[in-house]
Amino acid sequence: MEYLNFMADVYGVGAQERKAHIEKYLALFELENAAGEQIKSYSRGMKQKLTIIGALVHQPPVWVLDEPMVGLDPRAAHILKEEMRKHCEKGNTVFFSTHVLEVAEKLCDEIAIIDKGHLVAQGTLEALRSGEKGASLEQLFLELTESEEKQA
């Protein structure tokens, strides 16, 4: 709880709002029973959930998440994906990085492919396919990054 209160302090979250958001996310990610324990006793997945809660406790309109599914169990990953969808449905934005291209394919309205620090392609999945009907994001990624390597 100290970590989450610290994160709320950093963002100036008031006492009532803080309590409500922390309770909501602890319940959502099934961490209520572990809230009083030291973080060093947490598993990798529990630490990841706690980090996510800390990032969301101030309800930012834009979420920037780096590999947010790493370490999460399937239930927690599903919950996070649903929260990301709900956030976007409210007119907000979620930027997230992932190496699991199927997740990006299912969740994203816009996709950016970055290879060795360079933006290789950006747009909707349909636009990126541009004539390659049925091409998966994985196939597109491999084609785009391979051609970049050959050009170098």
Regions found by a protein language model. Name each.
Residues M1-F96, L101-D115, L119-A121:
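ABC transporter nucleotide-binding domains
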Residues A8, M84, E132, L144-T145:
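Hydrophobic aliphatic residues
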Residues V94, E126-A127, E143-L144:
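Short C-terminal domain-edge/linker segments immediately following a structured domain
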Residues H118-Q139:
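Conserved beta-strand-loop-alpha-helix hinge in the C-terminal portion
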Residues E148-A152:
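ABC-family P-loop ATPase nucleotide-binding domain
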